Swiss-Prot record:
This is Polyribonucleotide nucleotidyltransferase. It catalyses: RNA(n+1) + phosphate = RNA(n) + a ribonucleoside 5'-diphosphate. The gene is pnp. One of its GO terms (cellular component) is cytosol. Belongs to the polyribonucleotide nucleotidyltransferase family. The lineage of its organism: Bacteria, Pseudomonadati, Pseudomonadota, Gammaproteobacteria, Moraxellales. Residues 558-617 form the KH domain.
């Protein structure tokens, strides 16, 4: 009798063979082991059978982790253990969470924890697709009321062709890195960066990925059917009809009027005032045992009333919350150079959303070293997004970036990264920081706009300005409305969050999260069309202030220069044990990097520091010229002449017969060590030996 009851499915997925199995590892949880190409991921899902008392939100937690042993590596952190989640791991956790969360029933609050662990990797591909497939399969075989399965695909675009699940090497040649996740019938999530692809090309990639992932969904469904786990029966609590009727009849008109208040804080204040009045009017006796439950139910009913009011207004053709029509972008204000001592800065305001964005240029020592399964990554570009509580008029503890901030920062980075110059052309390390100072929707896209402006203000020669816009959707049956430049409320109460960034020529980043099924290609096409019009409108406003990068690097930024030397002279610049280059750095304050080909990159604090470093290096590496007179120092006296140092690390011989016009019997009668003399270079032989003469040269 075998100890394990293993069930597995095998299938070809692009160029990778995929094996999904359960029943052999982590049997006390709903576990799946996914082998995909050279990657193995263990995914375990634990589903609580009951909700915690008083639980009022869905406590779904996804943790993705990469174990260094998976690639045969020992962690470099203190204690040689894996530390807290890296930025990449956090982003993958979000990637798994986003398409899974909408597939649970509304009101379901049982705790679910999903842990995805990369346990083996050949370092040729990312493990995120395998992890998401594993999470979907683990939930499918569990008793959770999960309306899946869901699957994921990565799509590249190489030589004009879509490529399914490209390797890391293939992605280097690809104009697209897109991840799409969905169910059998619907796309739920898209995450991508691109090199200015068209709307049609991006939509084609989404549809291609969704079509290709059907084989994954079929195999997961087949496995779940074979296992046959009975699902938890969840029925949403029945609302008190009298409370719903009372709320709508007494306060429906007031809520509708409140949603004509264009100022966010004033609108929120009015809506809270109406909510408090509704509780007083409808909750009954505050001393009764059921009072707190009634208040909780009334708050849910009130939220539903707000939800229905906003959506009905939009679908009936009424103006949006702030008075706009479906396609109008909020009022824009663009300023650059707002912070005098930063290297580049911009203040981008769109309605009640505002980003203060800075660019800082650093030298090669500022590069971000990232330890990953694939090896150490040298990241020359960073974009950090900060969302303080005051940006929405709230208080709270400030600390390390939360998952949302990391995700928004990565999206903004994707939006501008394709426009950055190659590091060979522009070797600076670049750090962009977006401080969200006001927020009412689409702060990540404001960060894209602000980042583009701050980079240009710093003198970074980006290929083209970039702008971003967030689109929304309200859909009821066959009726739908696509909204341009959504507010925070429209994001919260709508069915789709669709963010698009790009230049005038194409899309550089696209992120989509859909909360409902039934989003058709026609709807996505309409959203992309409106996003294009909105993006061009925003770019026009930005270009009126700063149409292209400044021609010179900001005066406060490090000054950069590159020079070439004879590779044979590299050792002279470095010196014994690095003594010479350390001295150069200490004397000039410049950062100096030398490669094996003799290319020297110099970053000075200012132009003077860079020039000083260049002058010293040129002196060290200078070659003597035959026929040229030099002033040198007598370095050593020998019987047959004297060695004179004419250049740093360069000595030549003045033979005893070349010291004076008359015959010299004793060199020491004419020269002393340390004496300054003028010499003429007579010859340099094929071994590099330098012959000098003092004859006929007037000595001072």
């Amino acid at each position: 009798m075998t100890m394990f009851n293993t069930i597995k499915r095998e299938f070809q997925y692009g160029n990778q063979q995929v094996v999904i199995e359960t029943g052999r590892i982590a049997r006390q949880a709903n576990s799946i082991l996914v082998h995909m190409g050279g990657v193995t991921v263990l995914v375990a899902a634990v589903v609580k059978s009951d909700a915690k008392e008083g639980q009022n939100f869905f406590p779904l937690t996804v943790n993705y982790q990469e174990k260094m042993y998976a690639a045969g590596k020992i962690p470099g952190a203190y204690g040689k253990r894996e530390g807290r989640a890296s930025e990449s791991e956090t982003l993958t956790s979000r990637l798994i969470d986003r398409p899974i969360r909408p597939l649970f029933p509304e009101g379901y609050v049982n705790e679910i924890q999903i842990t995805a662990t990369v346990v083996s990797s050949d370092k040729t591909q990312s493990a995120d697709i395998a992890a998401l497939i594993g999470a979907s399969a683990a939930l499918a075989i569990s008793d959770a009321p999960f309306n899946g399965p869901v699957a994921a695909a990565r799509v590249g675009f190489i030589n004009g062709e879509y490529v399914l699940n490209p390797t890391l090497e293939e992605l280097k040649e690809s104009d697209l890195d897109l991840v799409v996740a969905g169910t059998k019938s619907a796309v739920l999530m898209v995450e991508s960066e691109a090199a200015e692809l068209s709307e049609d090309q991006m939509l084609g990639a989404v549809l291609y990925g969704h079509q290709q992932q059907q084989i994954v969904i079929d195999n997961i469904a087949s496995m779940a059917a074979e296992i046959g786990t009975a699902k938890q029966q969840y029925t949403a609590p029945v609302r008190d009809q009298a409370l719903e009727t009372g709320m709508k009849e007494q306060f429906g008109a007031q809520v509708s009027d409140a949603y004509t208040i264009t100022d966010k804080q004033a609108r929120y204040s009015k809506l809270n005032e109406i909510k408090d009045a509704a509780i007083v009017a409808l909750a009954g006796d505050a001393e009764s045992e059921s009072y707190s439950d009634t208040v909780s139910e009334l708050k849910e009913i009130y939220n539903d009333l707000k939800y229905r009011t906003v959506r009905d207004n939009i679908l009936s053709g009424k103006p949006r919350i702030d008075g706009r029509d479906l396609e109008t972008v909020r009022a824009l204000d663009v300023q650059v150079g707002v912070l005098p001592f930063t290297h580049g800065s911009a203040l981008f305001t769109r309605g009640e959303t505002q980003a203060l964005v800075t660019t800082t240029l650093g030298n090669t020592r500022d590069v971000n070293m990232i330890d990953s399964l694939a090896g150490t990554i040298r990241d020359h570009f960073m974009l950090h997004y900060n969302f303080p509580h005051f940006s929405v008029g709230e208080t709270g503890r400030e600390g390390i970036p939360k998952r949302r901030e990391i995700g928004h920062g990565r999206l903004a980075r994707r939006g501008v990264q394709a426009m950055l110059p190659d590091s060979d052309r522009f070797p600076y390390v670049i750090r962009v920081v977006s401080e969200i100072t006001e927020s009412n929707g689409s702060s990540s896209m404001a960060s894209v706009c602000g980042a583009s402006l701050a980079l240009m203000d710093a003198g970074v020669p980006i290929k083209a300005p970039v702008a971003g816009i967030a689109m929304g959707l309200v859909k009821e049956g066959e009726r739908f409305a696509v909204l341009s430049d959504i507010l925070g409320d429209e994001d919260h109460l709508g069915d789709m969050d669709f963010k698009v960034a790009g230049s005038k020529d194409g899309i550089t980043a696209l992120q989509m999260d859909i909360k409902i099924e039934g989003i058709t290609p026609d709807i996505m096409e309409q959203a992309l069309k409106q996003a294009h019009a909105g993006r061009i409108h925003i770019l026009d406003a930005m270009n009126k202030v700063l149409p292209e990068s400044r021609t010179e690097i900001n005066a406060h930024a490090p000054n950069y220069a590159v020079i070439e030397i004879n590779p044979d002279k590299i050792r002279d610049v470095i010196g014994k044990g690095g003594a010479t280059i350390r001295q150069l750095t200490e004397e000039t304050g410049a950062v100096i990097d030398i490669d094996d080909a003799g290319t020297i990159r110099i970053f000075g604090e200012n132009k003077a520091a860079t020039k000083a470093a260049i002058a010293k290096i040129e002196a060290i590496t200078a070659e003597v010229e035959v026929g040229k007179t030099y002033e040198g120092t007598v370095a050593r006296i020998v019987d047959f002449g004297a060695f004179v140092n004419v250049l740093p690390n360069t000595d030549g011989l003045v033979h005893i017969s070349q010291i004076a016009d008359e015959r010299v019997e004793n060199v020491s009668d004419y020269l002393k060590e340390g004496q300054i003399v003028k010499v003429l270079v007579q010859d340099v032989d094929n071994r590099g030996r330098i012959k000098l003469t003092m004859k006929g040269i007037e000595q001072s």
